[in-house]
Amino acid sequence: PAAVPPSRALRDGREYERLNLAEHFLLADQPPKDVPARFVVLGQVRQGRRAKAAGLALLSRVAVVCCLADAVSCCFLADLGQAPEGQWLEVYGRLEPLTDPKLAKSPPPGPEASVSACNERYRIVVEAAEPVAPPEMPYIFEFRDREPFAW
């Protein structure tokens, strides 16, 4: 079998592109051919009132463009099972259209960012999720529009 490049991960016989949540947030608005069919992202579990009522949670990571004053918590809705608030997860999945965009409205601000933005068009269909230690640098500073992504 061919080796999997470092920009990808192999799980259960499927190949996933590694990218960060901010990159995925930006790519989700592009033509479908530009969005990875399967991906792996790293994020922190957050609870939102509307999401929780629908059996979902927010997978979130703070993106910084210039400085922490302009930080935005980028979020996607996902079924993260019983993962506790604040848990870091490596999530393997794919996108699916969000049937109720109201679920993504007004996500609670995260502890590190005063602004949260939840993707209102798509949710992550979780194929696998693994608890991981918090990253050394929890913030996203780099955004790429093609592979290899910043992960």
Labelled PLM ranges:
Residues 1-151:
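OB-fold and OB-like single-stranded nucleic-acid-recognition modules
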